[in-house]
Amino acid sequence: IRVLAGDIDGHTGPGKSQTPMSIAHVTVMPGASVSIPWNPLFNALAFVLAGAGTVGEGDFAAPIKTSQLAVFGSGDRIVLTANPTQDSRTTAFEVFLLGGQPIREQVVQYGPFVMNDKQGVIQAMEDFQHGRFGHIPPDAIQPFRG
């Protein structure tokens, strides 16, 4: 378990955020299972980067595989189990885990913009169109070559 931001079971990641959250990259070897303590005040979701396995345990275990997303209900643990065999492209069950304290605010979305009200979305669109979001040089982001 690599904690990227926030805190998981007393381990703190290097990333910072404006709201309480936890983000981790979890690697589960074939046939293994991990039970991760989770803040019961946080929501949680898991996105599978590679491999296949299950989320949850017992009667609540659900199958999940590459590019699928699981949204968890309330609770204080997240259980991830890797299938005993993985496909030839991966050696493990790789999961991006994230969650945080729900902000319980109105959300308005239009295209890639998400704000708290319609006026906020309109302002974000205008800011983007006028170049106020800044500039990323073409060579600043290197492609992922997994």
Q: What annotation goes with each model-predicted range?
A:
Residues 1-146:
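Jelly-roll (double-stranded beta-helix
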